[in-house]
Amino acid sequence: PFSLRAVELLKRVGVHAWKIASGEANNVEIMKSISETNNEVFLSTGMSSINEIDLSVKKIKDFGLPLTILQCTSIYPTPPEKIGLNMINYLRNRYECNVGLSDHSGKLYTGLAAASIGIEVLEVHVTFSKEMFGPDVSSSISIDELKLLVEGVRFIENILEHEVDKDAIAEELKPMRKIFRKSVVYLKDMKEGTIIKRQDICFKKPGTGVKPEDLNNVLG
């Protein structure tokens, strides 16, 4: 909301969370009014300095409201060098709360990159067509891109939730290892008693025989 009147309207509507835009980040009256609902607050940091974020966070926490801080840069569209994913973990560590990204890049890559770092919230602008007229069309993704973004974020979340044990995977892949690994093989039939030299052998699939790392046990 951008005014106390808007806050009162949204209270009557029954919203379950509040977004404080960076332009309202120092608006104590709005913060006080929304605090009466005890709903979660999403604080955008698009135009705020660290000192200003400190003050906003303190005020919101003083009101006892659940808080998620959104890394954001108020440039439309935001170029990649200004997106600031480095701030995700910085904000999380500094304020010890949930952190998300409010993205104005107009690209789905940004949200995927943020998801790979680990975020609780991803906010994007969406347009029905990039040919439409409007102040944030250039900062928006299409409906089709939104679908891909959601699928990608869920895929990445699944990756991050499951750590891999390399030894366990190697054991699981034993049948494949036998197919793709190689064994020590003689290049030609050898007579009994022949002294085997390096030039007499090669490595070939499958890996069901003497392992290449055991080559020295065969030579001589």
Where are the model-predicted features located?
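Catalytic cores and adjacent flexible loops of soluble metabolic enzymes
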Residues: 1-220
